[in-house]
């Protein structure tokens, strides 16, 4: 019973991860990447602190959803034909690290919004924005480690389609170099999130079919082992 619940909860968390994350982002929004002084000053003057904090809260919920997904994936990939516990463990550690590094970034944004209401020097504001955006860029390295480790575990063990594993390896490597390449500020930075969404969605809506196949296989094995009677 516990495994059945977990096998639905984990993938569902992966499926909801991206939509909840994007919902929070659309609620609070950020200024442009590397904004001009005029743009940043205008954004700070018009942003609603209450709405911003609510959006940050929703986005934080989205970030946390990756934990049950990773925990489920950890158990799933270890069921493969070959031992993949080492990359699976690396994925789990990297996930916890990514969450720990990502959550404080939005709190820094919230602090900036709060202080701007009392007046804030634009150079100080730009410094905080630069730190926040650079910090987000560096989380791409950790996110890349998550996918790279997951991909290696999948390809090695074969518990999940190896196509998903190779896709994770490629996207993971790309995410690790996205900061230096400057692609962390483009839609390409969402590829890792899309992979989590796709895997979560597939295993959310396909478990019933998988159980039917397993049950059919078991019945065939039992039937084949019964002696013929007259």
Describe the residue ranges of each PLM region.
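Hydrophobic, aromatic-enriched alpha-helical segments typical of multi-pass transmembrane helices
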Residues: 1-230
